[in-house]
Regions:
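N-terminal glycine-rich flavin-associated loop
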Residues: 124-132
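Amphipathic, small/basic residue-rich leader segments at the start of a protein or domain
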Residues: 1-124
Length: 132
């Protein structure tokens, strides 16, 4: 079974429950309306569905290992992490002056949820980095 991001549900929550329109009225968040949220979520979903989710199967077949002082990661994890960083997903919520995207937590949380749902084993590394 493959991962399908619940974008429609997330957008419903953002618009009808969280009031993203009110968020867009706040200083500094004028550019973050429902259309922006949808574009970000669709791109995050594409990355999570196409790149991250398939790592689950590969991780089951070829798990990371520590042998003779060397760590061997699951095939594909290193490449996926590189794409994660290059895509700017690590800094979704972080201020732009520090290299982040400066997105509101409302949008960033949905991106994080998709990452965790698509492969928790992959998502643990960025999660720890984000908390550092």
């Amino acid at each position: 079974m493959s991962y399908q991001a619940p974008i429609k549900d997330m957008l419903f929550v953002m618009q009808d429950l969280a009031g993203i329109g009110q968020l867009a009225a706040l200083p500094g968040f004028e550019d973050y309306d429902l259309d922006t949220a949808q574009a970000v979520l669709e791109e995050s979903a594409r990355f999570c569905q196409d790149i991250v989710a398939p790592l689950n199967w590969e991780g089951d077949r070829n798990p990371s290992a520590f042998k003779d002082g060397q760590v061997t990661t699951t095939p594909g994890f290193q490449q996926a992490y590189r794409q994660f960083i290059e895509g700017g997903w690590q800094g979704v919520i972080h201020p732009t002056e520090y290299g982040g995207q400066g997105l509101p937590k409302l949008i960033a949380t949905a991106c994080t949820e998709m990452l965790h749902a698509s492969s928790l084993s992959f998502a643990l590394c960025p999660m720890l980095t984000d908390g550092a």
